């Protein structure tokens, strides 16, 4: 999930590692994100949790588990305005819950960043596109990753062979080394 997922999968294949450094199913990444969020809330006396997301389920999860906590959301200018504005308007807190940022930088750094965001958020499966599809109902937008995971026959995505297996049955993938 996210802008670097494809490159992490590709690098794992190039290096011929035993397993991928990222989850091969989005729902597993979502569940991991939720577990990390709970850990941030647990240590709130040492840190100030800030959650950058435009996923409606993730936002609802944070709102529910952060009811009695102080935190903030973060989003890129122009992304998920409607849902973040809703939470800001209807929250019972006396502070602004969403920090909006606009990326800045030199051309060589900024353009690749913006392209990754465009690719990530332009995907047909992205929350941003789902939110703007009037044919989808709320249950198709708010997807509980635990329910999704419970329906899997196996945790590993069967559509993505492990790095050593990408050339099977012809041959096993070799180990790669970054010289």
Place the predicted regions along the sequence by residue:
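Positively charged, amphipathic and often flexible ligand-engagement surfaces
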Residues: 1-173
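Short, intrinsically disordered, charge-balanced linker/junction segments flanking boundaries
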Residues: 174-179
């Amino acid at each position: 999930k996210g802008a670097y997922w494809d490159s992490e999968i590709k690098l794992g294949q190039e290096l011929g590692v035993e397993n991928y450094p990222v989850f091969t199913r989005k729902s597993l990444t979502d569940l991991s994100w939720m577990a990390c969020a709970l850990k941030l809330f647990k240590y709130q006396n040492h840190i100030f949790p800030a959650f950058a997301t435009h996923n409606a389920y993730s936002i609802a999860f944070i709102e529910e588990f952060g009811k009695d906590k102080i935190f903030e959301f973060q989003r890129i200018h122009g992304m998920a305005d409607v849902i973040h504005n809703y939470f800001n308007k209807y929250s019972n807190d006396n502070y602004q819950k969403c920090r909006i940022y606009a990326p800045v930088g030199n051309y060589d750094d900024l353009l690749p960043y913006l392209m990754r965001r465009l690719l990530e958020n332009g995907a047909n499966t992205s929350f941003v596109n789902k939110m703007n599809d009037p044919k989808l109902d709320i249950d198709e937008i708010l997807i509980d990753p635990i329910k999704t995971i419970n329906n899997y026959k196996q945790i590993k995505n069967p559509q993505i062979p492990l790095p050593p297996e990408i050339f099977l049955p012809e041959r096993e993938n070799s180990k790669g080394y970054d010289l």
